[in-house]
C-alpha cells in the first residue's frame, strides 16, 4: 500500500493553500496595525490573541472530530479561519482586530489538529515518519511561498483580503473529492488530552514537542533581531532566514525516512546533538552558512519525529487526543521560548539566544540518553 494515498495527497494540497493564507496574514497584520498608528503593545496583544486562539482551538477539536469526522471538521475549521480573515476588513480597530485574530487563531489550530490527526490515523508505525515529514514540507513550503507573495503583490488591506479569503475557501475544495475515515468513531473508548500528557511511555515525545516549540519559536521570532543587531541590512536578513527555512524543508523527508528505518529514538538523539552543535557554531560566527543550515535542518525536523515517537506508544483510537496534546505542548513551548530568550537578549547579550537553545536541547538530550531502549513493537501498529 502506498504511503501517499489519494486522500493524503488531496489533504496536503488543501493544506498548502491554507498555509499560504496563514503566512500572508501573519506577515501583513502587524504591518497593517503599524500603519494604523497603533502602539507596539497593542500590536503585541493582537498577536497574542491569535496564539491564544491556537490554544483554544487545540483543546476542543478532538471532540469535534469524534462527533462529525475529519472532513466536516476540516470544512468548519476553514470557514472559521475565513471568517477571521473577512472580519479584518469589516471593522478596523484594536479590540475588533484582537477578536478577529482570536477567531482566526482558533480556525488555524483546528486545521492543524485535523490534518495532523488525519495523517497519523492514515499511516502506520512504518510510514508515519514520512507522512509527518511530508506534512511539514508542505507547511514550510507554504510559509516560504507566502513570504514571496507578500513581496510581489500589493500589501493594501482591501486588496489582500479578497484573494486571501478566496485561497482559504479554495483550500476546502480538495477534500470535497475524498473522504477521510475516522476509525475513532468506531470505538467506545475515549481519551483526554490530560491523560495523554501524563502517559509515561510517550513523555519523550511530549517533551520533544515542547523543546521543538522553544527552538523554532525562538529562531523564527528572534533570529531576524539577532541578525539586525549584527549590522545586517534587511535584504541580508531575508537571505539568511531563507537559508534557515530552506534547510528545514530539505531536512524533512530524509529525517522522516531515517526515523522510519532506524527508529525515532536514535534519530531524535542525533537531531538534538546537531542542534547543540549548530548553536555553538553560531556563537563562533566563523561559518554562519553551514551553522544556520544544520541548525535549520535539525531544529525544524524535531517536531514531526517527536510526534511520531509519541504516537507509536498509544492505541489507534488515542491518536487524535495524543495529537492534541503534542500540538498543545508545541504551542506552549513556542510561547515561552521567545519570551524568555528575548528577556535574556535585552538584559544581557544577543548570544544568549543560542546558549538558551543549546541548553534546553542538552537537557532533552540527557532525557533521550536515559531511555535505554525503544519499544520494539509499537502499540499503534495499525
Swiss-Prot record:
UniProt main location, coarse: membrane
Subcellular location(s) of the protein: Cell inner membrane
A Pfam family of this chain: MFS_1
Highest taxon listed in the record's lineage: Bacteria
Molecular function via GO: transmembrane transporter activity
Sequence intervals crossing the membrane: 8-28, 45-65, 75-95, 102-122, 131-151, 157-177, 204-224, 231-251, 270-290, 291-311, 325-345, 349-369
Gene Ontology cellular component list: plasma membrane
Topology versus the membrane: Multi-pass membrane protein
Range of residues in the leader sequence: none
Keyword Cell membrane recorded: yes
UniProt keyword list: Cell inner membrane, Cell membrane, Membrane, Transmembrane, Transmembrane helix, Transport
Family named by the database record: Belongs to the major facilitator superfamily. YcaD (TC 2.A.1.26) family.
Entry-linked HAMAP family: MFS_YcaD
Protein name: Uncharacterized MFS-type transporter YcaD
Organism name: Salmonella heidelberg (strain SL476)
Gene: ycaD
